[in-house]
């Protein structure tokens, strides 16, 4: 891969992670109220469902991440990251327009099934980085995390 292509790939990964983490950040302040409205309960009851939603996402991601990793080895990092972003978009649409709590669970499970974008992005960074630039390039993922977790909750707070 040429130097320009590697730089473009690193930029793609940074933007992808920024979008991904900003999306996570947006739902943080919104989800408790959304759950409470869907279950017609208070915030205490909503927190129980929030825990189960988090578990549903985490367990499906835990189970499917090795499969996603194998697929990224076979078909390339970029297509897997793009599919993962599409699935996250679908998850966020389901979160926004869920008529019932079940749809929230469906959305989080879909996101968990394809939620290996961070590990795939890390593998992509390792693939395109020279040993001298690897730490700097991994730092870009950290910067995307930090920026996403600043921007996302602000947007979520304004929308929620």
Question: At which residue positions do the language-model features occur?
Answer:
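Pair of pore-lining "gating" transmembrane helices in MFS-fold secondary transporters
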Residues: 6-37
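Hydrophobic core of transmembrane alpha-helices in multi-pass small-molecule transporters
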Residues: 18, 91, 102-116
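Small-residue (Gly/Pro/Ala) motifs that create kinks and tight helix-helix packing interfaces
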Residues: 32, 148-160
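Extracellular/periplasmic helix-loop-helix junction of adjacent transmembrane segments
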Residues: 34-62
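Interfacial helix-cap and linker-helix signal at transmembrane-aqueous boundaries
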Residues: 36, 71-72, 158-160
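Residue-level signature of mid-helix packing/kink "hotspots" within the transmembrane helices
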Residues: 58-66, 116, 149-150
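Conserved MFS/SLC helix-loop-helix module at the cytosolic interface between two early adjacent transmembrane helices
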Residues: 62-99
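Cytoplasmic helix-loop-helix junction between adjacent transmembrane helices
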Residues: 107-146
């Amino acid at each position: 891969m040429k130097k320009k292509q590697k730089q473009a790939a690193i930029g793609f990964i940074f933007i992808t992670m920024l979008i991904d983490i900003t999306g996570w950040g947006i739902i943080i302040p919104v989800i408790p109220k959304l759950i409470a409205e869907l279950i017609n309960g208070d915030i205490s009851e909503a927190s129980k469902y929030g825990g189960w939603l988090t578990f549903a996402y985490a367990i499906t991601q835990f189970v499917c991440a090795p499969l996603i990793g194998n697929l990224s080895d076979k078909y390339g990092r970029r297509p897997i990251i793009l599919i993962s972003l599409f699935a996250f978009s679908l998850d966020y649409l389901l979160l926004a327009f869920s008529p019932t709590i079940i749809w929230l669970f469906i959305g989080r499970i879909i996101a968990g099934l394809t939620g290996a974008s961070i590990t795939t992005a890390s593998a992509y960074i390792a693939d395109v980085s020279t040993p001298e630039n690897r730490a700097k390039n991994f730092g870009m993922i950290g910067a995307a995390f930090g920026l996403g977790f600043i921007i996302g909750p602000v947007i979520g707070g304004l929308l929620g």
